[in-house]
């Protein structure tokens, strides 16, 4: 295929006329399709329905230490839930605190606590002149919303298939004590689906921060969320807590996880893994905040999954639903846009997103055109702090939620919008 940039003005005008016609025909269909969030589909939710039958009025609702899970108590999680989430997080159960239904909630609480009370005896952030966070971009919009909410200055750090630009991370963290943290989705990152290389993880562990209360916010949201069952087709991520301990920085990381996209989003269990010193510090606040989280839900999850093998078997069923959707979107992008020079996209082996890079200055227009044609997508710019993509080029594609027939229609609408926006940009130059 001829690249759009190599076409003459006359060729581009003829192509625009053709694309305008296609776009008008799409709009006339009155579509109402949604690719805006990385939500599990109804089919995915259905595979967890047996969990609803695990507990009944005749079930022994005591955990393995004999505590009645119907009552108050066990502030940081029942032992069997710690063991299960520890396996998912690749850490020992003693390094885990079990929370409620949302790891995002745990991250918000962690930042909030740091603002009001500081980290392990250090000055509360609210008493400092300036607090900054590093934000690998493109990244997860809800991370950025947390730091924006607290008035924390966010600094963009470019991503590559190896992870964040570690030269930049090392330099900034070592020179500026106002930098208190970095947001990371280290495995099947949002939205690109990249997994940090072993060297990147080791460089994180060896950081020498100017701030004694600097923390890596390691959001391990997609630790077991592979698209393929063959281990050769799965990404591997080095375990960060272990690496930090080896490097003499045991307290430098908070590792977050949840079962939100394993069982039921919003009704799963979340966990924080960290060093003993960090967990001791955190427990001081949790004992004031709660008498305990939902132990019946913890028990329900343990009885349903039993162990990590049970989780992997369950995730294989998720993958069987997700894989054809990702492959269909990727095939459509390749067939319709390959070789045209108007877009690039990732082909992840796991996670929930495909990252699309349009021609510079086209993302907002593409998303707006798709919406007008009946396809709702994640807002352009959402993958950057403050919603400001400096190149206006990144679009997050979320294939998971729509049925595959609707997704196919949405993908076809998307490529027409990409072509039309690109032609209009070239004609305007």
Predicted regions mapped to residue ranges:
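N-terminal "arm"/small-domain region of PLP-dependent enzymes with the aminotransferase-like
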Residues: 2-76, 81, 86-87, 372-375
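Conserved PLP-binding active-site segment of the aspartate aminotransferase-like
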Residues: 355-360, 377-417
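Conserved core segment of the aminotransferase class I/II
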Residues: 99, 241-323, 336, 423
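Conserved glycine-rich beta-strand-loop-beta hairpin in the small C-terminal domain of fold type I
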Residues: 316-330, 342-357
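Short amphipathic alpha-helices in soluble, non-transmembrane regions
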Residues: 366-372, 410-415
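Walker B catalytic acidic pair
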Residues: 220
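Conserved core of the PLP fold type I
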Residues: 67-212, 223-248, 363, 413, ...
């Amino acid at each position: 295929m001829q690249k759009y940039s190599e076409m003459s003005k006359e060729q581009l005008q003829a192509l625009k006329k053709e694309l305008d016609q296609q776009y008008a025909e799409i709009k006339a269909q009155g579509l109402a399709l949604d690719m805006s969030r990385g939500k599990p589909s109804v089919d995915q939710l259905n595979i967890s329905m047996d969990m609803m039958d695990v507990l009944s009025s005749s079930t022994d609702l005591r955990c393995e230490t004999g505590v009645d899970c119907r009552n108050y108590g066990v502030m940081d999680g029942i032992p069997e839930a710690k063991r299960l989430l520890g396996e998912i997080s690749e850490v020992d159960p003693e390094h885990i605190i079990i929370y409620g239904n949302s790891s995002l909630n745990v991250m918000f609480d962690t930042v909030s606590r740091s603002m009001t009370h500081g980290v392990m005896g250090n000055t509360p952030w609210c008493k400092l002149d300036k607090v900054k966070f590093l934000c690998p971009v493109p990244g997860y919009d809800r991370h950025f919303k947390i730091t924006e909410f607290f008035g924390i200055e966010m600094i963009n750090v470019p991503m590559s298939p190896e992870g964040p630009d570690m030269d930049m991370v090392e330099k900034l963290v070592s020179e500026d004590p106002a930098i208190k943290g970095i947001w990371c989705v280290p495995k099947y990152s949002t939205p690109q689906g990249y997994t940090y290389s072993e060297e990147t993880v080791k460089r994180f562990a060896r950081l020498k921060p100017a701030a004694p209360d600097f923390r890596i916010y390691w959001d391990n949201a997609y630790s077991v969320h592979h698209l393929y069952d063959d281990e050769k087709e799965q990404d591997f991520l080095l375990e960060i807590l272990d690496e930090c301990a080896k490097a003499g920085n045991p307290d430098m990381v908070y590792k977050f996880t949840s079962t939100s996209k394993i069982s039921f989003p919003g009704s799963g269990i979340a966990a924080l893994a960290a060093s003993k010193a960090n967990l001791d510090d955190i427990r001081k606040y949790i004992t004031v905040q709660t008498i305990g989280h939902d132990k019946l839900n913890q028990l329900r999850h343990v009885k349903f999954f039993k162990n990590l093998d049970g989780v992997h078997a369950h995730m294989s069923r998720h993958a069987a639903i997700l894989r054809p959707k990702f492959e269909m979107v990727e095939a459509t992008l390749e067939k319709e846009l390959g070789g045209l020079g108007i877009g690039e996209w990732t082909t992840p082996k796991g996670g929930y997103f495909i990252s699309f890079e349009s021609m510079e200055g086209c993302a907002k227009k593409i998303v707006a055109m798709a919406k007008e044609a009946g396809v709702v997508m994640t807002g352009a710019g959402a993958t950057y702090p403050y919603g400001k993509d400096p190149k206006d080029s990144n679009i997050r594609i979320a294939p998971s939620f729509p049925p595959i027939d609707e997704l196919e229609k949405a993908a076809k609408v998307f490529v027409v919008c990409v072509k039309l926006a690109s032609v209009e940009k070239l004609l305007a130059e």
